[in-house]
Amino acid sequence: MAIVLAKSRQTSSVARMKQSGPAGFKCLPIVLASLVLCSGCSILPGFNKKLPGNRAFIDYWAPDSNSKQLRLAVKDNIDIKGVVTTAGSEIFSRTHKPAEKDAPCLAIARRRKVQIVGKTNMTEFAVSTSGMNEYFGTPVNPLKRNLIPGGSSSGNAVALASGMTDVAFGTDTAGSNRVPAACCGVVGLKTTYGLIPIEGVYPVEPHLDTVGPMGKDIDHTVQGMDLLQDGFAAKYAAAKAAKPTARSIRVGRLKLKGTDPKIDQAIDDALAKTGFQVVELDDSLSDKFEQAKKDGTTVAAAGAWISDGRFEFALGVAARTKSVIQFGQITYTTGYRSALARRSAWQRTLRDVFEKVDLIALPTLQKTPPGLPLLNLRIGILEAHLLQVQNTVAVNFAGNPALAVPVPLSGAKVSFTSLQLIGPRLAEADLLNAGRLVESAVNR
Protein backbone atom coordinates (compact mmCIF):
# COMPACT_ATOMS: atom_id res chain seq x y z
CA MET A 1 0.00 0.00 0.00
CA ALA A 2 2.85 2.37 0.78
CA ILE A 3 4.22 1.99 -2.74
CA VAL A 4 0.83 2.68 -4.32
CA LEU A 5 0.46 5.77 -2.16
CA ALA A 6 3.93 6.96 -3.16
CA LYS A 7 3.10 6.61 -6.86
CA SER A 8 -0.16 8.50 -6.44
CA ARG A 9 1.69 11.33 -4.73
CA GLN A 10 4.20 11.47 -7.55
CA THR A 11 1.46 11.53 -10.17
CA SER A 12 -0.42 14.30 -8.42
CA SER A 13 2.76 16.38 -8.12
CA VAL A 14 3.48 15.97 -11.83
CA ALA A 15 -0.12 16.77 -12.74
CA ARG A 16 -0.12 19.95 -10.67
CA MET A 17 3.11 21.09 -12.30
CA LYS A 18 1.71 20.45 -15.78
CA GLN A 19 -1.41 22.44 -14.95
CA SER A 20 0.67 25.37 -13.69
CA GLY A 21 2.48 25.68 -17.03
CA PRO A 22 5.84 27.48 -17.42
CA ALA A 23 5.32 29.44 -14.20
CA GLY A 24 5.60 26.15 -12.37
CA PHE A 25 9.34 26.10 -13.07
CA LYS A 26 9.91 28.09 -9.88
CA CYS A 27 8.66 25.09 -7.92
CA LEU A 28 10.72 22.43 -9.69
CA PRO A 29 13.39 22.08 -6.98
CA ILE A 30 10.62 21.54 -4.44
CA VAL A 31 8.98 18.96 -6.67
CA LEU A 32 12.30 17.15 -7.18
CA ALA A 33 12.75 16.95 -3.42
CA SER A 34 9.19 15.72 -2.88
CA LEU A 35 9.45 13.08 -5.62
CA VAL A 36 12.52 11.61 -3.93
CA LEU A 37 10.88 11.77 -0.51
CA CYS A 38 7.78 9.93 -1.79
CA SER A 39 9.70 7.28 -3.69
CA GLY A 40 8.69 4.55 -1.30
CA CYS A 41 12.05 2.78 -0.94
CA SER A 42 15.45 3.20 0.67
CA ILE A 43 17.87 5.48 -1.15
CA LEU A 44 20.69 5.80 1.34
CA PRO A 45 24.23 5.67 -0.11
CA GLY A 46 24.94 2.02 -0.88
CA PHE A 47 28.02 -0.14 -0.47
CA ASN A 48 29.04 -2.89 -2.85
CA LYS A 49 31.83 -4.99 -1.34
CA LYS A 50 33.14 -5.98 -4.78
CA LEU A 51 34.41 -2.46 -5.38
CA PRO A 52 37.93 -1.47 -4.32
CA GLY A 53 38.52 0.88 -1.43
CA ASN A 54 37.10 4.31 -2.09
CA ARG A 55 34.48 3.15 -4.65
CA ALA A 56 35.99 5.35 -7.35
CA PHE A 57 35.94 2.50 -9.87
CA ILE A 58 33.35 0.08 -11.20
CA ASP A 59 36.09 -1.86 -13.05
CA TYR A 60 39.70 -1.41 -11.96
CA TRP A 61 42.82 -2.75 -13.64
CA ALA A 62 45.77 -2.09 -11.37
CA PRO A 63 48.67 -0.56 -13.32
CA ASP A 64 52.16 -1.99 -13.30
CA SER A 65 53.94 -0.27 -10.42
CA ASN A 66 57.08 0.08 -12.56
CA SER A 67 55.29 1.60 -15.52
CA LYS A 68 55.85 5.25 -16.38
CA GLN A 69 52.93 5.40 -18.79
CA LEU A 70 50.24 8.01 -18.29
CA ARG A 71 47.34 6.49 -16.37
CA LEU A 72 43.86 7.14 -17.78
CA ALA A 73 40.52 6.46 -16.10
CA VAL A 74 37.33 6.39 -18.17
CA LYS A 75 33.86 7.26 -16.90
CA ASP A 76 31.56 4.27 -17.15
CA ASN A 77 29.19 5.84 -19.67
CA ILE A 78 31.95 5.72 -22.33
CA ASP A 79 32.33 2.45 -24.24
CA ILE A 80 35.51 0.39 -23.89
CA LYS A 81 35.63 -2.67 -26.12
CA GLY A 82 34.97 -5.87 -24.21
CA VAL A 83 33.62 -4.14 -21.08
CA VAL A 84 30.00 -3.59 -20.08
CA THR A 85 29.07 0.10 -20.02
CA THR A 86 26.93 0.34 -16.89
CA ALA A 87 26.30 4.11 -16.86
CA GLY A 88 26.35 3.67 -13.09
CA SER A 89 23.22 1.51 -13.17
CA GLU A 90 22.40 -1.87 -11.67
CA ILE A 91 19.99 -2.65 -14.49
CA PHE A 92 22.66 -2.04 -17.16
CA SER A 93 25.25 -4.05 -15.24
CA ARG A 94 22.87 -7.03 -15.27
CA THR A 95 21.39 -6.78 -18.75
CA HIS A 96 23.92 -5.14 -21.09
CA LYS A 97 26.51 -7.00 -23.12
CA PRO A 98 30.14 -5.84 -23.33
CA ALA A 99 30.76 -3.04 -25.80
CA GLU A 100 31.73 -4.28 -29.26
CA LYS A 101 34.12 -1.40 -29.89
CA ASP A 102 35.70 1.60 -28.21
CA ALA A 103 34.00 4.98 -28.27
CA PRO A 104 35.78 7.15 -30.89
CA CYS A 105 37.00 9.54 -28.16
CA LEU A 106 39.42 6.80 -27.04
CA ALA A 107 41.16 6.50 -30.42
CA ILE A 108 44.16 8.74 -29.65
CA ALA A 109 44.70 7.17 -26.23
CA ARG A 110 44.75 3.73 -27.85
CA ARG A 111 47.22 4.84 -30.52
CA ARG A 112 49.56 6.22 -27.89
CA LYS A 113 49.20 3.10 -25.73
CA VAL A 114 48.12 5.03 -22.66
CA GLN A 115 47.48 2.77 -19.66
CA ILE A 116 43.71 2.65 -19.06
CA VAL A 117 43.30 1.81 -15.37
CA GLY A 118 39.55 1.32 -15.20
CA LYS A 119 35.95 2.43 -15.63
CA THR A 120 34.94 4.97 -13.01
CA ASN A 121 31.86 5.16 -10.85
CA MET A 122 29.21 7.80 -11.52
CA THR A 123 25.68 8.82 -10.65
CA GLU A 124 23.18 6.57 -12.38
CA PHE A 125 22.64 7.55 -16.03
CA ALA A 126 24.65 10.76 -15.28
CA VAL A 127 21.46 12.57 -14.29
CA SER A 128 22.25 14.09 -10.89
CA THR A 129 24.91 16.25 -9.32
CA SER A 130 25.56 14.81 -5.86
CA GLY A 131 27.83 12.02 -7.10
CA MET A 132 25.93 9.44 -5.07
CA ASN A 133 25.31 5.92 -6.36
CA GLU A 134 22.94 3.55 -4.57
CA TYR A 135 24.13 0.31 -6.21
CA PHE A 136 27.90 0.61 -6.69
CA GLY A 137 28.32 2.79 -3.61
CA THR A 138 29.10 6.48 -3.40
CA PRO A 139 32.75 7.37 -4.13
CA VAL A 140 34.45 8.69 -1.01
CA ASN A 141 35.65 12.28 -1.20
CA PRO A 142 39.30 11.91 -0.08
CA LEU A 143 39.53 15.50 1.12
CA LYS A 144 36.67 15.13 3.58
CA ARG A 145 34.85 11.83 3.80
CA ASN A 146 31.52 13.24 4.92
CA LEU A 147 31.18 15.58 1.92
CA ILE A 148 29.60 14.69 -1.41
CA PRO A 149 32.10 13.90 -4.18
CA GLY A 150 30.00 15.79 -6.74
CA GLY A 151 28.66 14.34 -9.95
CA SER A 152 27.99 12.93 -12.20
CA SER A 153 31.71 12.18 -12.81
CA SER A 154 32.22 11.40 -9.13
CA GLY A 155 34.54 8.44 -9.61
CA ASN A 156 36.83 10.47 -11.86
CA ALA A 157 37.28 13.21 -9.27
CA VAL A 158 37.84 10.78 -6.41
CA ALA A 159 40.32 8.69 -8.42
CA LEU A 160 42.28 11.82 -9.34
CA ALA A 161 42.28 13.28 -5.84
CA SER A 162 43.31 9.89 -4.42
CA GLY A 163 46.24 9.53 -6.83
CA MET A 164 44.79 6.45 -8.56
CA THR A 165 44.99 8.02 -12.02
CA ASP A 166 46.67 10.97 -13.72
CA VAL A 167 43.92 11.84 -16.20
CA ALA A 168 40.26 10.93 -16.58
CA PHE A 169 37.78 11.18 -19.43
CA GLY A 170 34.35 12.31 -18.34
CA THR A 171 31.17 13.77 -19.72
CA ASP A 172 29.67 17.16 -18.98
CA THR A 173 26.01 17.86 -19.78
CA ALA A 174 25.18 20.33 -17.01
CA GLY A 175 28.42 20.46 -15.02
CA SER A 176 29.35 16.79 -14.59
CA ASN A 177 33.11 17.34 -14.94
CA ARG A 178 33.29 20.71 -13.20
CA VAL A 179 31.09 20.06 -10.15
CA PRO A 180 33.03 16.99 -8.92
CA ALA A 181 36.27 18.79 -9.68
CA ALA A 182 35.03 21.60 -7.43
CA CYS A 183 34.06 19.16 -4.67
CA CYS A 184 37.31 17.16 -4.70
CA GLY A 185 39.90 19.87 -5.44
CA VAL A 186 40.94 18.79 -8.94
CA VAL A 187 40.66 20.28 -12.44
CA GLY A 188 37.75 19.71 -14.80
CA LEU A 189 37.31 20.92 -18.38
CA LYS A 190 34.01 21.18 -20.24
CA THR A 191 34.84 21.24 -23.95
CA THR A 192 33.13 23.17 -26.73
CA TYR A 193 29.90 21.49 -27.78
CA GLY A 194 30.55 19.28 -30.81
CA LEU A 195 34.35 19.36 -30.55
CA ILE A 196 34.83 15.81 -29.25
CA PRO A 197 32.73 12.97 -30.71
CA ILE A 198 30.04 11.60 -28.40
CA GLU A 199 29.33 8.40 -30.32
CA GLY A 200 29.74 5.41 -28.02
CA VAL A 201 28.77 7.54 -25.01
CA TYR A 202 25.51 6.88 -23.16
CA PRO A 203 23.45 10.04 -23.78
CA VAL A 204 21.73 12.44 -21.42
CA GLU A 205 20.76 15.38 -23.66
CA PRO A 206 22.21 15.55 -27.19
CA HIS A 207 21.89 19.36 -27.29
CA LEU A 208 24.24 19.61 -24.28
CA ASP A 209 26.37 16.44 -23.99
CA THR A 210 30.15 16.84 -24.21
CA VAL A 211 33.22 14.69 -23.50
CA GLY A 212 36.20 16.29 -21.77
CA PRO A 213 39.24 15.67 -19.58
CA MET A 214 39.77 15.95 -15.86
CA GLY A 215 43.21 16.05 -14.27
CA LYS A 216 44.86 16.25 -10.89
CA ASP A 217 46.37 19.54 -12.07
CA ILE A 218 46.50 21.75 -15.17
CA ASP A 219 49.43 19.94 -16.79
CA HIS A 220 47.65 16.60 -16.63
CA THR A 221 44.41 18.15 -17.88
CA VAL A 222 46.36 19.46 -20.88
CA GLN A 223 47.66 15.94 -21.47
CA GLY A 224 44.11 14.66 -21.26
CA MET A 225 42.91 17.20 -23.81
CA ASP A 226 45.77 16.19 -26.10
CA LEU A 227 44.44 12.63 -25.92
CA LEU A 228 41.03 13.84 -27.07
CA GLN A 229 42.06 16.23 -29.85
CA ASP A 230 44.99 15.64 -32.19
CA GLY A 231 47.36 18.59 -32.18
CA PHE A 232 46.08 20.13 -28.96
CA ALA A 233 49.54 20.26 -27.38
CA ALA A 234 50.66 22.62 -30.17
CA LYS A 235 47.58 24.81 -29.66
CA TYR A 236 48.32 25.01 -25.95
CA ALA A 237 51.96 25.91 -26.60
CA ALA A 238 50.80 28.68 -28.95
CA ALA A 239 48.38 30.01 -26.33
CA LYS A 240 51.17 30.13 -23.74
CA ALA A 241 53.47 31.92 -26.18
CA ALA A 242 50.80 34.45 -27.14
CA LYS A 243 49.89 35.28 -23.53
CA PRO A 244 52.69 34.15 -21.24
CA THR A 245 51.59 36.38 -18.35
CA ALA A 246 48.24 37.24 -16.81
CA ARG A 247 48.64 40.97 -17.46
CA SER A 248 47.69 40.46 -21.10
CA ILE A 249 44.46 38.57 -20.33
CA ARG A 250 41.19 40.46 -19.80
CA VAL A 251 38.88 38.63 -17.42
CA GLY A 252 35.27 39.67 -16.93
CA ARG A 253 34.19 39.08 -13.32
CA LEU A 254 30.59 37.88 -13.09
CA LYS A 255 28.89 38.01 -9.69
CA LEU A 256 25.66 36.18 -8.93
CA LYS A 257 23.18 36.65 -6.11
CA GLY A 258 23.20 33.96 -3.46
CA THR A 259 26.93 33.25 -3.57
CA ASP A 260 28.70 32.78 -0.25
CA PRO A 261 30.68 36.02 0.32
CA LYS A 262 33.73 33.98 1.36
CA ILE A 263 33.67 32.19 -1.98
CA ASP A 264 33.30 35.44 -3.92
CA GLN A 265 36.24 36.83 -1.96
CA ALA A 266 38.33 33.73 -2.72
CA ILE A 267 37.64 34.15 -6.44
CA ASP A 268 38.55 37.84 -6.33
CA ASP A 269 41.73 37.09 -4.38
CA ALA A 270 42.80 34.42 -6.88
CA LEU A 271 42.22 36.72 -9.85
CA ALA A 272 44.13 39.56 -8.17
CA LYS A 273 47.03 37.34 -7.14
CA THR A 274 47.29 35.97 -10.67
CA GLY A 275 47.42 39.50 -12.07
CA PHE A 276 44.67 39.44 -14.69
CA GLN A 277 43.11 42.61 -16.06
CA VAL A 278 39.79 42.27 -14.25
CA VAL A 279 36.67 43.94 -15.66
CA GLU A 280 33.47 43.97 -13.59
CA LEU A 281 30.53 42.73 -15.65
CA ASP A 282 27.19 44.43 -15.12
CA ASP A 283 24.05 43.07 -13.49
CA SER A 284 22.25 42.67 -16.80
CA LEU A 285 24.58 39.79 -17.69
CA SER A 286 23.95 38.25 -14.27
CA ASP A 287 20.21 38.28 -14.99
CA LYS A 288 20.74 36.69 -18.40
CA PHE A 289 23.06 34.09 -16.88
CA GLU A 290 20.37 33.14 -14.36
CA GLN A 291 17.80 32.77 -17.13
CA ALA A 292 20.22 30.61 -19.12
CA LYS A 293 20.77 28.53 -15.99
CA LYS A 294 17.02 27.90 -15.74
CA ASP A 295 16.75 27.13 -19.44
CA GLY A 296 19.75 24.81 -19.36
CA THR A 297 18.31 22.98 -16.36
CA THR A 298 15.02 22.58 -18.20
CA VAL A 299 16.73 21.13 -21.28
CA ALA A 300 19.07 18.87 -19.28
CA ALA A 301 16.24 17.51 -17.14
CA ALA A 302 14.03 16.95 -20.17
CA GLY A 303 16.91 15.03 -21.71
CA ALA A 304 16.83 12.64 -18.77
CA TRP A 305 13.19 11.95 -19.57
CA ILE A 306 13.85 11.55 -23.30
CA SER A 307 16.83 9.22 -22.76
CA ASP A 308 15.64 7.29 -19.71
CA GLY A 309 11.86 7.65 -19.48
CA ARG A 310 11.47 3.92 -20.14
CA PHE A 311 13.04 3.26 -16.73
CA GLU A 312 10.59 5.39 -14.73
CA PHE A 313 9.09 2.35 -13.00
CA ALA A 314 11.79 -0.25 -13.73
CA LEU A 315 13.20 -2.51 -11.04
CA GLY A 316 16.93 -2.04 -10.58
CA VAL A 317 16.83 1.75 -11.09
CA ALA A 318 17.37 3.92 -8.01
CA ALA A 319 14.44 5.91 -6.65
CA ARG A 320 16.43 9.13 -6.84
CA THR A 321 17.12 8.50 -10.52
CA LYS A 322 13.43 7.90 -11.14
CA SER A 323 12.63 11.21 -9.48
CA VAL A 324 14.98 13.01 -11.88
CA ILE A 325 13.30 11.26 -14.81
CA GLN A 326 9.90 12.42 -13.53
CA PHE A 327 11.29 15.91 -13.06
CA GLY A 328 12.38 15.73 -16.70
CA GLN A 329 8.90 14.73 -17.80
CA ILE A 330 7.56 17.90 -16.19
CA THR A 331 10.13 20.15 -17.81
CA TYR A 332 9.69 18.48 -21.19
CA THR A 333 5.97 19.24 -21.21
CA THR A 334 6.13 22.70 -19.65
CA GLY A 335 9.24 24.42 -20.97
CA TYR A 336 11.59 22.36 -23.14
CA ARG A 337 10.81 23.89 -26.54
CA SER A 338 10.59 27.47 -25.27
CA ALA A 339 13.93 27.05 -23.48
CA LEU A 340 15.62 25.79 -26.64
CA ALA A 341 14.15 28.75 -28.54
CA ARG A 342 16.06 31.12 -26.23
CA ARG A 343 19.39 29.38 -26.77
CA SER A 344 20.58 31.41 -29.77
CA ALA A 345 19.95 34.70 -27.94
CA TRP A 346 22.09 33.52 -25.01
CA GLN A 347 24.84 32.48 -27.40
CA ARG A 348 24.77 35.94 -29.01
CA THR A 349 24.97 37.56 -25.58
CA LEU A 350 28.15 35.66 -24.77
CA ARG A 351 29.68 36.45 -28.16
CA ASP A 352 29.11 40.14 -27.44
CA VAL A 353 30.76 39.82 -24.02
CA PHE A 354 33.80 38.13 -25.55
CA GLU A 355 34.27 41.15 -27.82
CA LYS A 356 35.23 43.03 -24.63
CA VAL A 357 36.96 40.39 -22.50
CA ASP A 358 38.94 37.22 -23.15
CA LEU A 359 37.38 35.09 -20.42
CA ILE A 360 34.60 35.23 -17.82
CA ALA A 361 35.30 34.32 -14.19
CA LEU A 362 32.90 33.21 -11.46
CA PRO A 363 32.70 30.44 -8.85
CA THR A 364 31.95 26.93 -10.05
CA LEU A 365 29.72 26.46 -6.99
CA GLN A 366 28.05 29.25 -5.01
CA LYS A 367 28.45 27.30 -1.75
CA THR A 368 30.96 24.85 -0.30
CA PRO A 369 30.27 21.16 -1.02
CA PRO A 370 27.44 19.90 1.22
CA GLY A 371 27.65 16.86 3.44
CA LEU A 372 26.31 13.43 2.54
CA PRO A 373 22.72 13.08 3.78
CA LEU A 374 22.03 10.56 6.52
CA LEU A 375 18.27 10.39 6.03
CA ASN A 376 16.14 9.67 2.98
CA LEU A 377 14.27 12.94 3.19
CA ARG A 378 17.51 14.90 3.02
CA ILE A 379 18.56 13.39 -0.33
CA GLY A 380 15.84 15.13 -2.30
CA ILE A 381 16.61 18.38 -0.53
CA LEU A 382 20.30 17.94 -1.37
CA GLU A 383 19.67 17.42 -5.09
CA ALA A 384 17.33 20.43 -5.20
CA HIS A 385 19.96 22.53 -3.39
CA LEU A 386 22.64 21.53 -5.88
CA LEU A 387 20.46 22.66 -8.79
CA GLN A 388 20.48 26.13 -7.28
CA VAL A 389 24.16 26.50 -6.34
CA GLN A 390 25.98 25.14 -9.42
CA ASN A 391 27.02 27.81 -11.94
CA THR A 392 27.69 25.33 -14.72
CA VAL A 393 24.62 24.53 -16.79
CA ALA A 394 24.30 27.99 -18.37
CA VAL A 395 27.65 27.27 -20.07
CA ASN A 396 26.40 23.96 -21.45
CA PHE A 397 23.29 25.74 -22.70
CA ALA A 398 25.51 28.06 -24.75
CA GLY A 399 27.92 25.33 -25.87
CA ASN A 400 31.03 27.24 -24.75
CA PRO A 401 34.04 25.67 -23.03
CA ALA A 402 34.72 26.19 -19.33
CA LEU A 403 37.42 25.23 -16.84
CA ALA A 404 37.11 24.53 -13.11
CA VAL A 405 40.35 25.00 -11.16
CA PRO A 406 40.81 24.90 -7.36
CA VAL A 407 41.76 28.05 -5.44
CA PRO A 408 42.29 28.64 -1.70
CA LEU A 409 39.34 29.43 0.57
CA SER A 410 39.60 30.87 4.08
CA GLY A 411 37.23 30.60 7.03
CA ALA A 412 35.15 27.69 5.73
CA LYS A 413 34.76 23.95 6.37
CA VAL A 414 37.04 23.21 3.41
CA SER A 415 40.29 24.94 2.46
CA PHE A 416 39.50 25.40 -1.23
CA THR A 417 36.80 26.43 -3.65
CA SER A 418 36.71 26.33 -7.44
CA LEU A 419 37.19 29.13 -9.94
CA GLN A 420 35.27 28.66 -13.18
CA LEU A 421 36.67 30.31 -16.29
CA ILE A 422 34.41 30.48 -19.35
CA GLY A 423 35.80 31.09 -22.82
CA PRO A 424 34.60 31.66 -26.37
CA ARG A 425 33.97 28.62 -28.53
CA LEU A 426 37.12 26.55 -29.18
CA ALA A 427 39.09 28.44 -26.50
CA GLU A 428 40.21 25.32 -24.60
CA ALA A 429 43.90 26.18 -25.01
CA ASP A 430 43.36 29.74 -23.77
CA LEU A 431 41.38 28.48 -20.78
CA LEU A 432 44.08 26.01 -19.79
CA ASN A 433 46.76 28.67 -20.22
CA ALA A 434 44.81 30.95 -17.87
CA GLY A 435 44.33 28.01 -15.51
CA ARG A 436 48.09 27.43 -15.56
CA LEU A 437 48.65 31.03 -14.47
CA VAL A 438 46.06 30.76 -11.69
CA GLU A 439 47.47 27.47 -10.43
CA SER A 440 50.99 28.87 -10.37
CA ALA A 441 49.93 32.06 -8.58
CA VAL A 442 47.79 30.51 -5.84
CA ASN A 443 50.34 27.78 -5.10
CA ARG A 444 53.24 30.19 -4.64
Model segments located where?
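Short, well-ordered alpha-helical
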Residues: 40-103, 125-128, 369
